[in-house]
């Protein structure tokens, strides 16, 4: 059961309606979380600006790596909406569906390279229980300070977003289907 619902579009301030219109043009529909965030227009605007800054074209983190991290954090936080929309973005960024379907098994899958493994390990540590000194040293030896800030900010943002959506029980909106075409939850390994 959803804890909070959106309200009729006419009841949102003009700035929120403009943001929702832009989403409809980009995604073909309004994203359900935006109807919730839109209840607090200033927070919604700040959130949108932060996401835009973190997922910009000029980011020092490659687009596919950014998307891998956002999907994995979404899986860890059991956010159906985030897994759905971020997996669709990951596929649009050229990552094969087979790899997306194996994301929860990244440690043993041969489909992930060293950079991806480090980013996913870092994302899991931040999301689950914190980063130890050994992992900090590996991150520091691989990425520049600016890259560390960018990827850490993205992971923190995705934790905020996915925990918000999971807590409010925001459902998937059907953006991404896994290879076999079923609705299997890609957050857990195959049995």
Could you tell me what each predicted segment is?
Residues 1-191:
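Hydrophobic alpha-helical segments
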